[in-house]
Amino acid sequence: MALIHEILGKLSLEGNQSCARQSALGTVKASTNFDAEKDAAAIETAIKTKGVDELTIINILTNRSNDQRQDIAFAYHRRTKKDLASALKGALSGNLETVMLGLIKTRPQYDASELKASMKGLGTDEDTLIEIICSRTNKELLDIQNAYRELYKTELEKDIVSDTSGDFRKLMVALAKGKRQEEGSVVDYEKIDQDARELYEAGVKRKGTDVGKWITIMTERSTPHLQKVFERYKSYSPYDMEESIKKEVKGDLENAFLNLVQCIQNKPLYFADRLYESMKGRGTKDKILIRTMVSRSELDMLKIRKEFKKKYGKSLHYFIGQDTKGDYQRALFNLCGGDD
C-alpha cells in the first residue's frame, strides 16, 4: 500500500511539475485556495442579480485555470441542475459572452468548436482553419481530433476533406494528422542540408513547384530541425523561405505555408502578429482577438506580450485598451495579465 502511495505521489508531483512548466509563460494560473462550490454559488448569484453582475463572472472565470473552470462548471450543474454554458448564454451577450463561453470549454473542445464553426455552412473560414491547424502541437492536434469526434460524431479529417480542395487540402490533412517528428537532442546537419536543398529544388530552382515535397518536409520534420533548415535554405536560394512561398504559390495554399513557416520560426511572434492584425486600422477582428487571448492565456501569453512590445513599440495591453471597451475590455485585460 505504501508503495502505491509513493507511486501516486510521484505521478502527482510529475504532473504538477509539467503544469508548472506549462503555466510559467501563461498569464492565467490556477487559483490558490480554490473552492469550486463557492465559485459556482457566486456565479449563480451573479446571474440571478437584476441586470446581471458581469464583474463577478469575469473575475472568477478569468482568474482560474482551465481545469478549475471545468470543476466550477461541474459544481454549477450539481447545484442548479443547469448547464453553465446555457446559463451564461442567457445572462451575457456579444463579445463578453463569446469570451466567457470560450473559457469554460476545455482547450481541445474550444479548438474543435472553432474549427467546426470555420467549416460549417456555405464557404469556409480558411483563416481560422489555417491558424489552428498550423499552430498546434502533435499532442494538441490529437486531443482536438478526439474532442471533435466526441462533440460532432464525425472525424475532423473528413470535414477538412469535404471543405477544402487541391494542394491546400493535402497540406491541411497532413498537418491535422499531427505526425510531426518530436524534438530530438541530436542535430543531423546532413539531413538539414538535404532538406534545405530539396525545398529549393522543389520550388525556386525549377519551373512550377513540387508542392508534395514541400508538404512532406514541412509537416513531418521537427520544429528545431526546420528552423535550421530554413536558415540553411538561404545558402541555396536567393530568397528566404517566406519570399519563396510568395513567389511559388498563391491563395489559401500561400497563406497556409506562410502561417506554418511563421509558427515554426517563432510561435509567440506569430500570435503577436495575429493580435496586431486583429486590432490595427479601423474596426476590430474580434473573433481572432478573442480566440488568441482565450487559447494562449495559459500557454505563452507572457512571451506573446514580449514579442508584441518589441515589434510594435506599444504593449498588447495598450492596444486592447484602445480597441475595446467595458466588460469585454476588462475580461481581455485579465487574460492579458498586465501592462508592459
UniProtKB/Swiss-Prot annotation:
SMART domains: ANX. GO terms for cellular component: basement membrane; cytoplasm; extracellular region; nucleus; plasma membrane; vesicle membrane. Annexin repeats lie at residues 34-105, 106-177, 190-262, 266-337. Keywords: Annexin, Basement membrane, Calcium, Calcium/phospholipid-binding, Extracellular matrix, Phosphoprotein, Repeat, Secreted. Pfam families: Annexin. Transmembrane segments: none annotated. Belongs to the annexin family. This is Annexin A2-A. It comes from Xenopus laevis (African clawed frog). The gene is anxa2-a.
